[in-house]
UniProtKB/Swiss-Prot annotation:
PROSITE patterns for the chain: DAPB (PS01298)
Pathway entry: Amino-acid biosynthesis; L-lysine biosynthesis via DAP pathway; (S)-tetrahydrodipicolinate from L-aspartate: step 4/4
Gene Ontology CC terms: cytosol
Keyword Magnesium: no
Annotated positions binding (S)-2,3,4,5-tetrahydrodipicolinate: 154, 163-164
Protein name: 4-hydroxy-tetrahydrodipicolinate reductase
Lineage of producing organism: Bacteria, Pseudomonadati, Pseudomonadota, Betaproteobacteria, Burkholderiales
Binding site for NAD(+): 7-12, 33, 96-98, 120-123
Length: 265
């Protein structure tokens, strides 16, 4: 697999490069960075003390011309620009970017009619298995239990709630026959009145170097059930992204998520 990495000088980008270099079935074909980055022109493996022969570049057209897959954990506007180039060059996409608006997500879904892509706010196998647990739990606790989602991330994360927290909320809402827009409450402040039992509450914590902690609380009378996933490093995200790329090898077009990749549907 000839794989290019977008956001190659960032925390996640470096983890992805390391994973690609370690994978026997993958070759690093490109390393894309933002225009103006001081790392442009440097070898993509310099942070590992390795020479890959692949220099960091801001030329998306060149990157897509040399790669069969592009793994993108950047920001929505950047990902959509990369999507346009991927469509022109018939490059398969693995997208782990979070913070998309609904119209932007619609653009990703539409692209699946022309190229194969996996889009997921979290590529971790553990998180996606957790989604199945939440689907089951939500059906059992649909009545008489208040649902709250608490997430914590590092101080540099720019969007809230996290994409994973929103995925959890969407999973719970769908399992109970609703949409998240109908029942989400984001943070509370001041005199809010009594809790509406039909809502799903979200709380976001930002601090330090927390990779990603997510807890869903089902609070009933006399008992509480908590389902928690904690990420100790970004390795699980990188390995999940490679697994998604391998999945795409068998598809020419289509819009998929990690539930498809893992056979959890």
């Amino acid at each position: 697999m000839k794989i290019a990495i977008a956001g190659a000088s960032g925390r996640m980008g470096r983890m992805l490069i390391e994973a690609v270099l370690a994978a026997p079935d993958a070759t690093l074909a490109g390393a894309l960075d933002r225009t103006g980055s001081p790392q442009l022109g440097q070898d993509a493996g310099a942070f590992l003390g390795k020479q890959t022969g692949v220099a960091l570049t801001d030329d998306i057209e060149r990157v897509c011309a040399e790669a069969d897959y592009l793994i993108d954990f950047t920001r929505p506007e950047g990902t959509l620009a990369h999507l346009d180039a991927a469509l022109r060059h018939d490059v398969k996409l693995v997208i782990g970017t979070t913070g998309f608006s609904e119209p932007q997500k619609a653009q990703l879904r539409a692209a699946g009619g022309k190229i194969a892509l996996v889009f997921s706010a979290n590529m971790s196998v553990g998180v996606n298995v957790t989604m199945k647990l939440l689907e089951f739990a939500a059906k059992q606790f649909a009545q008489g239990y208040d649902i709250e989602i608490i997430e914590a991330h590092h101080r540099h994360k720019v969007d809230a709630p996290s994409g994973t927290a929103l995925m959890m909320g969407e999973t719970i809402a769908a399992a109970t026959g609703r949409t998240l827009d109908d029942c989400a409450v984001y943070g509370r402040h001041g005199v809010t009145g009594e809790r509406d039992p039909s809502t799903i509450g979200f709380s976001a914590i930002r601090g330090g170097d927390i990779v990603g902690d997510h807890t869903v609380l089902f609070a009933g009378i006399g008992e509480r059930i908590e389902i928690t996933h904690k990420s100790a490093s970004r390795v699980s995200y990188a390995q999940g992204a490679l697994r998604a790329a391998r999945f795409l090898a068998g598809h020419q077009a289509g819009f998929f998520d990690m539930q498809d990749v893992l056979g959890l549907r």
